[in-house]
Structure formats: structure tokens, C-alpha cells
């Protein structure tokens, strides 16, 4: 199948509600250009280039680590790590920073999304007149709805008019802006676009990675579900701009929950080329990237820097690089053997990668979310818990090294492990901690240094294997571990359809035979019991605990169980803040968290402080919306009072 070729230079239009100019790159004929006159959209080539650019814009959102931080930090899945700066501490809401219009990293979404929306407006306005099929125009409809859906969840109501009228292509500078209400954004933009996309997009993608009916149905179901929760408003969270929580079309929350269920089930029953992988491990394994469970991804490649969108040898630390995987990755390279050798080398392998240590999973991730580590493969398929000696990638030819308990360890045998068993038996002696340089301990008869999962800290925690790098050009060396990941960043998965339908069913949707909330959840839980590979054991396995997983599912499923399953299935992928905000469970799930150690700035041996500490977050109702970025406010030619009114309440000082 033909692939979408996306150069580094993104076609798009710049919009911060203050200037709207057109800058395009002709993607399809692979002739890079820096600027075009807006009339270019009145040509077939221009419209096609605009559509291709919409795939490229995904790189400026997904894999962008600071935006990723805004979707994860401050939830039950992540707090700030030992090396975090203000970007991460501000998002944690635990008293070590302050989330404001200037510090919130949701700004990465605002500018990118509106630029793409205006491009989509141009494509939709001009597509038919230049002979572009509705199927192709519907790709633009999908991406316009996609961006508006992200925006309305993040900021509340946002502008539909960028200066030329609602949902019109704007080519003139515009320094004023009026925000539409949440119901207007859903009913005027998101739902109509997704309905047309679901109707007109093909079942088979026109190019590899192209959008289809299935992904349109997933986002339509999710939009219906999110809007239903907004109408229900169980905890009386305020919205902005202020408006009644009523639907302009006269439907109630129950109607939208039903629509969410029906659309998700229709997508499950009409999957096209998509489906579930045999095992959870296969979904996220680098060699299996772009598999048929992935409905949408922000693509990258190791084959060419131009089409990768960034260097193949160093990381810029900014978009369009895919560097989100660096954030939940601790300094494993600090490890030493008992004879003082550096034995864990930074490599471009999925279990290793570049350690930035900006974010850390709290202990509840390991005690609650992933409590079952024996039957449920999702713990093993999410984290790196065993770090194996790889000194040969650094040119060392040692046959073995002396390690814990004076025992010998060979290349690719465990040097260090996080353990869930025998945690009370680990000996955290001062001598061992000094030798291994990690603050780790020993267990009798084991050659690897160990740290119990009850000792997880901001410094040391299992790395997020899911987002680790994978390249085939490493040779016998470390490869290019400092480059952004050349893997695609997965955005939407077929598996989510089951949990969307299950969530709608829990909220009262009438269910079909064989597709109750429990039935739907158990499809994924049964799959989670199927092991084809063990990361910890570093080998293929053939184990089936599907029956045990299904038997352990509660007879009655509630929304908390759905949220737990969503975390087990999609941990660390950028879903969590949206999930907790949608269901208004953020306070319940994340107002406190436990992690070892004091605050880094208090001065102590971060590696050996294994004392758990519970931290309190201050999550107020206004936090359920992010602040409008300061750059947007600064660029508007409006009065101080008008700008204040434009900003979400709680962020105006």
C-alpha cells in the first residue's frame, strides 16, 4: 500500500487568532516549498497538499513531550520526576509550581490545532470545485473535527470563526476573537464533520496510515460520550464560556450515551482491515509498529531525515521530534557492577532509550492499577522492569562482571531488576547501595541488584517500555539513542472501541446481546491473559491466562472499573487527563499520591531514601479546563477587560 510521504516542513496556516497567513509545502509531488498564495488552495494540487499536511501536523502534538506532560502529569499515572523542571512541576498541582496561562504546556495544542483547522477549512471550501472526491475532502473533515475535539476538551468553548465566518477559510490578519460555547463547538463542528467522515471515508485506507470509517467512528463515539458526560455534569463542574448545559438539538445525556454505544459497536462489527492483536505485547512492540490495531498514528521513519521530520542522530527537544518516550525513563545508566564497571549503556533499544527522568509513576500504579502481574500481561507489556547488561555496545569485551552477592553476570543477563515478590526480604545495605550506585539492594541467590516496587521514587521506577525507541540500524553499537524516536506515535487503537462502548453501557445505554459492559471489557481482559512474549524474561512465551482474567472480572462493572481498565490498556499514552476530566473523577483518582523520597531540592541522597511520602494535590473545579495560552491573549487587539473575559476563570490573575 502506498504510504503518505510527509516532509519536515509542514503545510499549514498560522493562527493564534491574531494572524492568518498561508504557508504550504507541496507534499504529494515531493517538491518542498516554503510559501504559497492562498489561491493555491483553488488547485487540485493545493488541496491534496493541504490534506497531506494534516497528517504531518499530528507530529506537533503527539510525541511532543511537553504537551504529553500536560496530558499525564498531575493524574494517577504520573507525577514529576527527579530531573523535572517547572514544565512538569507546574502540571503536578502539588504545591511545587503554579499552573498559569504562561506555564501550561497545553499551549502546544492551541497553535497547532488552529493552524490545521484553517487549512482544513480551505480544503473543505475548495475541494469539490477542483474535482476532489468527497472521500478525500472527508479526510479534512475528520481532522478539523479531531482538532476541535481536542480543543473543546482542553479549553472549553473555542472560536469557530477565525475572521472570515464560522468554519470559513481565513486569509486575512485577525486580532480579535470570540469563543463559541461547548455545545456550539460540538453541534456545529465536531458532530457534523465526523458524521460526514464516517459516511464518506473508505473502509480501506487510501494510503498506509490514512484515515478510514473506523477511526471516524471511534472519534464520533468518543465525542458523543464526552458530550454526554458534559451534559450530565455529575459533580457540577463549571464550564466556560458560561451557558446552560442543554443540547441545542434537544437531546439529553442518555441519548448521547446511547449514540456513543451504538457507533462504537457498529465499528467493532464492521472493522474493515482493523482488529485486535493476539497479545497485548504485540500492540506496542517496535518490530510490529503500524499493526492492524492502530487506527491513527503520527508517523516517523529512520530511513530519511526529511520525511522523519527531524534528525536521525540527535534530538532537538522539541516538535516535530517524537521525544515523549524520554520523559518516563530514569537514569538506569548510573548502574555499576560490584567491581565498579559501567554495565548498562544507553542504546536505541525499546527497553533502554534516552533517560530524561522528567516524569515518574506514583506507587499506586504498581499496587492498584497493575496489581495482577502474574496473569495480566499488561504490566510486563507496559514497563521495563529488568535491565540487562549490554556493555558490548560500548566496545567492552568482558565475558562477565561481578555483580550482586559477588555473583557473575554475562552480557544480556539481568544487572538490575524491579521486583514485586519478596520485597520484604530485600537487603538494602549501605555497601550494596554504594556498589551498585542506584540505592538498590540484594536478594539471596540472585546476581542482579534489586529494588522493590514499594521503593519506587522520583529517581528510580520502571521505564515506560511502550514508548521506547526501536531501530534496525544500531549494528553492534548503541545506535542513536539521543535522537528522537523514529517510531510512529500511536494515537488511536481499535481496542478503545470496546471500552468506549462499555463506558456508555455503564452510563445506561441499552446493550446488544453479547455486548454488555462486562462482555466488552472481557474481550480485552481475555486478550491481556494471552502471553506471547515476556519483556522481563527476554524471550517468547506461550501462556494463556484468559480464563483466569475473565473469572476475575467483577459481575457488575462501574465507571471506576472502566477507568482502571483504561489505565491498564493505555497507560502512559496521553489519555489519562482527558479520561479523568471527562468522567469528573480527577479529584477522586489523583488528589493524593505516594512516592518515595523527599523533594529533590531539599537535599538528600535521592538514591537511598526509600521512605514513602504521600503528597496532596490541589485540584479545583476550574482546573478541569486548561488556561488559554498567554501568547494568544498578548496577540489580540482587545481591551484588558475583554481579554480577561476571554480567559478561563481561575487563570485571570
List each language-model region with its residue ranges.
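Bacterial N-terminal signal peptides that target proteins for export
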Residues: 2-11
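Bacterial Sec-dependent N-terminal signal peptides
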Residues: 2-3, 18-45, 221, 502, ...
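Long, intrinsically disordered, low-complexity segments
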Residues: 24, 113, 282-349, 459-461, ...
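An aromatic- and glycine-enriched ligand-binding surface/loop that stacks and positions planar moieties
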Residues: 25-86, 158, 226-436
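Conserved, well-structured interaction surfaces
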Residues: 44-66, 83-155, 174-213, 427-489, ...
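Short coil/turn linking the two alpha-helices of tandem helical-hairpin repeats
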Residues: 152-159, 205, 223-235, 507-510
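C-terminal substrate/ligand-recognition segments
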Residues: 368-372, 376-527
Amino acid at each position: 500500500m502506498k504510504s503518505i510521504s510527509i516532509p519536515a516542513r509542514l503545510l499549514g496556516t498560522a493562527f493564534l487568532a491574531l494572524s492568518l497567513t498561508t504557508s504550504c509545502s507541496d507534499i504529494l509531488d515531493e517538491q518542498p516549498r516554503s510559501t504559497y498564495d492562498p489561491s493555491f488552495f483553488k488547485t487540485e494540487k493545493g488541496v491534496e497538499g493541504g490534506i497531506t499536511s494534516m497528517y504531518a501536523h499530528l507530529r506537533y502534538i503527539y510525541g511532543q513531550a511537553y504537551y504529553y506532560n500536560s496530558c499525564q502529569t498531575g493524574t494517577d499515572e504520573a507525577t514529576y520526576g527527579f530531573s523535572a523542571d517547572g514544565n512538569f512541576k507546574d502540571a503536578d498541582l502539588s504545591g511545587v509550581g503554579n499552573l498559569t496561562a504562561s506555564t501550561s504546556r497545553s499551549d502546544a495544542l492551541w497553535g497547532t490545532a488552529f493552524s490545521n483547522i484553517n487549512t482544513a477549512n480551505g480544503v473543505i471550501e475548495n475541494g469539490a470545485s477542483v474535482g476532489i472526491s468527497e472521500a478525500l475532502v472527508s479526510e479534512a473533515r475528520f481532522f478539523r473535527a479531531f482538532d476541535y475535539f481536542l480543543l473543546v476538551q482542553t479549553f472549553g468553548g473555542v472560536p469557530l470563526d477565525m475572521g472570515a465566518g464560522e468554519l470559513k477559510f481565513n486569509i486575512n490578519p485577525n486580532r480579535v476573537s470570540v469563543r463559541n460555547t461547548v455545545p456550539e463547538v460540538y453541534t456545529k463542528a465536531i458532530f457534523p464533520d465526523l458524521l460526514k467522515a464516517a459516511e464518506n471515508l473508505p473502509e480501506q485506507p487510501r494510503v498506509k496510515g490514512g484515515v478510514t470509517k473506523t477511526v471516524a467512528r471511534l472519534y464520533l463515539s468518543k465525542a458523543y460520550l464526552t458530550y454526554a458526560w458534559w451534559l450530565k455534569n455529575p459533580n457540577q463542574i463549571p464550564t466556560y464560556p458560561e451557558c446552560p448545559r442543554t443540547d441545542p438539538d434537544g437531546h439529553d445525556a442518555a441519548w448521547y450515551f446511547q449514540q456513543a454505544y451504538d457507533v462504537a459497536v457498529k465499528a467493532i462489527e464492521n472493522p474493515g482491515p482493523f482488529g485486535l492483536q493476539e497479545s497485548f505485547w504485540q500492540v506496542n512492540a517496535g518490530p510490529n509498529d503500524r499493526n492492524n490495531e492502530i487506527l491513527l498514528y503520527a508517523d516517523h521513519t529512520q530511513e530519511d531525515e526529511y520525511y522523519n521530520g527531524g534528525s536521525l542522530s540527535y534530538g532537538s527537544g522539541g516538535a516535530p521530534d517524537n521525544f515523549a518516550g524520554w520523559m518516563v525513563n530514569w537514569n538506569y545508566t548510573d548502574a555499576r557492577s560490584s567491581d565498579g564497571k559501567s554495565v548498562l549503556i544507553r542504546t536505541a533499544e525499546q527497553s533502554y532509550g534516552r533517560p530524561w527522568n522528567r516524569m515518574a509513576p506514583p506507587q499506586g500504579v504498581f499496587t492498584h492499577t497493575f496489581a495482577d502481574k502474574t496473569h495480566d500481561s499488561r504490566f510486563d507489556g507496559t514497563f521495563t522492569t529488568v535491565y540487562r547488561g549490554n556493555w558490548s555496545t560500548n566496545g567492552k569485551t568482558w565475558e562477565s562482571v561481578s555483580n550482586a552477592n559477588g555473583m557473575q553476570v554475562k552480557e544480556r543477563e539481568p544487572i538490575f531488576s524491579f521486583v514485586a515478590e519478596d520485597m520484604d526480604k530485600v537487603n538494602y545495605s549501605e555497601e550494596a547501595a554504594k556498589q551498585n550506585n542506584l540505592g538498590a539492594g540484594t536478594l539471596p541467590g540472585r546476581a542482579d541488584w534489586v529494588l522493590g516496587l514499594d521503593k519506587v521514587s522520583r529517581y528510580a521506577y520502571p521505564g515506560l517500555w511502550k514508548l521506547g525507541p526501536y531501530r534496525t540500524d544500531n549494528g553492534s553499537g548503541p545506535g542513536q539513542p539521543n535522537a528522537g524516536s523514529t517510531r510512529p506515535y500511536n494515537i488511536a487503537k481499535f481496542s478503545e472501541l470496546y471500552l468506549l462502548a462499555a463506558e456508555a453501557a455503564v452510563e445506561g445505554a441499552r446493550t446488544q446481546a453479547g455486548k454488555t459492559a462486562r462482555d466488552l471489557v472481557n474481550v480485552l481482559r481475555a486478550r491481556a491473559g494471552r502471553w506471547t512474549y515476556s519483556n522481563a524474561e527476554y524471550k517468547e512465551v506461550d501462556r494463556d491466562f484468559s480464563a483466569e482474567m475473565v473469572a476475575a472480572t467483577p459481575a457488575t462493572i462501574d465507571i471506576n472499573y472502566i477507568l482502571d481498565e483504561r489505565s491498564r490498556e493505555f497507560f502512559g499514552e496521553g489519555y489519562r487527563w482527558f479520561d479523568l476530566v471527562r468522567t469528573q473523577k480527577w479529584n477522586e483518582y489523583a488528589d493524593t499520591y505516594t512516592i518515595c523520597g523527599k523533594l529533590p531540592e531539599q537535599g538528600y541522597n535521592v538514591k537511598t531514601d526509600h521512605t514513602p511520602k504521600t503528597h496532596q494535590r490541589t485540584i479545583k473545579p476550574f482546573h478541569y479546563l486548561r488556561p488559554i495560552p498567554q501568547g494568544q491573549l498578548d496577540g489580540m487587539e482587545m481591551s484588558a477587560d475583554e481579554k480577561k473575559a476571554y480567559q478561563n476563570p481561575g487563570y485571570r490573575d
